[in-house]
Amino acid sequence: MAELSEVIKVYGKRFGFISAPPSYMRKLERELKDLGYKPEKIEAFYKGEPEDWFYVPYLKMSDGLKLAKEYNQENFVTEAGVTDTSTGKTKRFAPSGHKFGADALASESYAVYPKGTAISVALENDA
């Protein structure tokens, strides 16, 4: 089985983590550059705790929805709430201790994935 703790660290205007197979890391890097982002560095590293959250500031909600569908995930978590991939509707919520504001909800530019969901499933399927 592939290592579920493999994650991608992205440095840029803001930093983020996403758990992903190497092929997705390359795809993400290309897409970020196409969107005009200029990450200083993208490196693979290991993050140990399975309950960690991975923050991907670069993804718009529409991109997060597309990604979740690509990996057959029923829903995904964003700063705005939990989005159902079948309907595209988001139930808004504020996770305990998670900071967010109206500007984040308006821009829909901050996707958050808990470990063990969409991308980790892809890693399991690659094994």
Task: Go through each PLM region and give its residues.
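Intrinsic-disorder/low-complexity regions
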Residues: S62, T83, E124-N125
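Short, flexible beta-strand-to-coil junctions
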Residues: S19-Y24, Y58-K60, T78-V82
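Short, intrinsically disordered low-complexity segments
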Residues: G36-Y71
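Hydrophobic beta-strand segments of well-ordered beta-sheets in folded domains
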Residues: F15-G16, W53, E74-N75
